From Swiss-Prot:
Location(s) in or outside the cell: Cytoplasm
CDD domains assigned to the protein according to its UniProt record, in alphabetical order: ABC_RecF
Cross-referenced PROSITE patterns: RECF_1, RECF_2
UniProt name for this protein: DNA replication and repair protein RecF
Listed GO CC annotations: cytoplasm
Amino acid sequence: MAEKTFINRLQLTDFRNYGSASLRLDGRHVVLTGNNGSGKTNLMEAVSFLSPGRGLRRAVLSDVARAGAASGFSIFASLEGMAGDVELGTGSEVLDETAVRRLRINGASVRSVDELTDHLRVLWLTPAMDGLFTGSSSERRRFLDRLVLSIDPQHGRRASDFERAMRSRNKLLSEGRFDASWLAGIEQQMAALGIAMALARQEMMRLLAALIEQRREPETFPGADLMLSGFMDEHAGTAAIDLEDTYRDSLAGSRGRDAAAGRTLEGPHRSDLLVRHREKDMEAERCSTGEQKALLIGLILAHAELVATMTGFAPILLLDEIAAHLDEGRRAALFDRIDVLGGQAFMTGTDAQMFASLGDRAQFVTVDDGHLSL
């Protein structure tokens, strides 16, 4: 069984609607209840900032600081992490009218937020993700890349470096600057990064599909079949170096077409995640709203189990309004699955009774307009 990581103290300053708030926890699950708009999701967003990226809302830093705050926001967490007891601090400060993120680990400044993954992995499911299967391919790519990032912390850096190189190429092409050697250098970089991204996605999906096949519980949460489409689909099993050569040559041959289009038309940024309901053999987007929600929960739980298997440590789960659309049986099954994972889960809802079956497996916290009480 995976070892547990858990937060035992959380402190927020000038974060969203929290002027100053502190919460002491004991390692059990955490249920946050309160009226809509009281700050439940804001607190979970703060926890999500203990991982690389822009948090569960993908927020701009300047929007996160409390209105009227003198400077930026700060988040402090003490936790039992993957490397033992650790104190994490992150927040923002304004430099030249621009909000910049800062990070400290055990009081020492750290340059890269990727170092957070040495101490914990954080996964989340929010109501904003309910339209994942019917929404845009860019939303599914973002979802997929967060799944990859949880087991391959370098994936985010590769993705940002690829985007940077692609923007440089697009700029040269849009300006009509067809400098062969310059473009060739950029395209070589894009090929190496793009294929590495694609292979990391495929490997994560292979591992996840194998786990779903082994662990699926169709009576509770339906099984999902996963497939990638839109980039190098026809080259499965080809060596990475050959894939890089193929993509690099394709980029070189499509300069005129890409210049006319004003963007790069082929690459990992064009991939799409295709999901099918296994038991019904139906595309996820054609399933009912309830079936889509159950599919998504099943995917998140399977991925959490994969992270625990790959790292040896259970991730922290953030499940926003998770119980609202589940019947009593599925709620109980969900809570049991979370227990089996062995980690700490934060859950929100307006009615504490929805979580009654958790009993003493959870701490119940009341949230009232940015104020917390146990």
